[in-house]
């Protein structure tokens, strides 16, 4: 019985994109299909560790590639776990994977088709070279079924009880007319070597071997008759008569005989078992692509072994690009493959490395873990904890080595800086080493980024703190009023523009005995001479009345108004409490859909307003307030200064309309416009209309 199903909309869209768009790199389809077959073999082998009977009559796990020139088909077959009917329907058509939409978006943004495997939709790459695909699959839990589609929006699933598959999956590609090159033996050998040489199972390619054998005329006639029945003609080559008498009596000829047989294409032993000195850069790149489905080579490699009480070998690869779903909350990490004595155990062991290292790819092969270890036991296993600790240690070594190459480290940091910062937040043991990997723009670094270590070496004599500000962008922070005094004193300020920086700075307090000081918060004081301190005290006393008046006008909008020692050219700013949220953090938390309102209210407490006593506006405001505390223009100016301080300090306006009204009033003052006269002009047409209406009514009454 045959059933017809419609493809899920996103899958149908993806297939249409693959079929109707020209891509030169079509060869990746074979890599994707072999990779899927390898995964299927991994799954059945893992099951067999606890239940040997699942292998049944097909104990040998292998992958076969079979070209058929006569029927113009290419078959990829494995003896893996196979698929049930439900698997065929769901996995190959009706349920879109999370990566389907992401992959299409990546393609439309100019991405390479080679990335398809990273998004979990590699099977559909078959339609790059085939106009029809047939999938026959047999799972131990179900009968055999055949899935087939020509990508016309639907697919069929048919029960196949007479299938010769004992277990596994057979994918038959009916090749397009212009893709017949993938039936050539040499082409297939090259592709397997290029993309799949280090797959952990035998990849058997069906090849044709031609041999020559001598036959007598009688044997040759019989062979010719037999081949004639089969529609073939033997190729004959004459040989010279020998001197032997028997040879003269029985004339012999050489006949070419063609036999088909499977030949293993990936004969190299596992790469991680070899000495790193004997492995070439090309072999590492090939192996990395095989285990990661990446189309690019890795950025860097760490190949190491640990011996002693505990033995294991590992290869860690650092990709050039971050995975598209790296920080998805429900994503299961499958970046490190776990082997025990060369036997694959699993590729989603989340306890093998911490979450912040989830971008690393690689393999770990342990000599000490039991083959039949369960996922539950892994979490408590002491050996695994030691392996995890060593992976983190070697990863840090890899990053430190990479830091020696400025260009490569820049590529790494652009892609994975968030992971490094997440590590600082989560890994207190390695926090100091991770902090050395940080890079920031600063007021002195220009377009380059600086390390914390370099910042400390450039600190001014007597400078006790590492100064920094947080915000949306480097451009905004370069003109921030918070850094004015620091710049005037020749002190460098770090610019932290990544939202995760806010969380990082909650965990770190100092670096090389130098405390961090956020210039947007209270409690920041620059070193002053005795004369400067005296002058500051005099200014505070002189402006005490203005500060008090401003507080009375602003009321609950501010905690207090004080004389600033961090401003140089701006009239005023708003600073937060030392342990509260910065303006940037407030903005981040406001955008959190599930934020804790009570926590937000506590952390977003009233701000302190700081005024610059050297600024002309503040001086004039002081004069006006001292002359008349009820001066309306002075009150308007205080509110206007508060609102502009909100904006320049990185906060949002509570009442934009009131702010606009004040600006409009100031514009009128600048243009010497009279509010009362303007109101009379605005009311005149209304009054005229009213009088006109009244007059008309009166006339009607007279009539």
UniProtKB/Swiss-Prot annotation:
Residues 224-247 have a biased composition (Basic and acidic residues). Coiled coil: none annotated. InterPro entries: HATPase_C_sf, Heat_shock_protein_90_CS, HSP90_C, Hsp90_fam, Hsp90_N, Ribosomal_Su5_D2-typ_SF. One of its GO terms (cellular component) is cytoplasm. Molecular chaperone that promotes the maturation, structural maintenance and proper regulation of specific target proteins involved for instance in cell cycle control and signal transduction. Undergoes a functional cycle that is linked to its ATPase activity. This cycle probably induces conformational changes in the client proteins, thereby causing their activation. Interacts dynamically with various co-chaperones that modulate its substrate recognition, ATPase cycle and chaperone function. It comes from the Eukaryota. Pfam families: HATPase_c, HSP90. Belongs to the heat shock protein 90 family. The TPR repeat-binding motif mediates interaction with TPR repeat-containing proteins. Keywords: ATP-binding, Chaperone, Cytoplasm, Nucleotide-binding, Stress response. Gene3D superfamilies: 3.30.230.80, 3.40.50.11260, Heat shock protein 90, C-terminal domain, Histidine kinase-like ATPase, C-terminal domain. GO terms for molecular function: ATP binding; ATP hydrolysis activity; ATP-dependent protein folding chaperone; unfolded protein binding. GO terms for biological process: protein folding; protein refolding; response to heat; response to unfolded protein. ATP binds at residues 36, 78, 123, 375. A motif (TPR repeat-binding) lies at residues 699-703. It comes from Trypanosoma brucei brucei. Its main location: cytoplasm. The gene is HSP83. It is found in: Cytoplasm. Residues 211-247, 678-703 are annotated as: Disordered. This is Heat shock protein 83. Homodimer. CDD domains: HATPase_Hsp90-like (cd16927). HAMAP family: HSP90 (MF_00505).
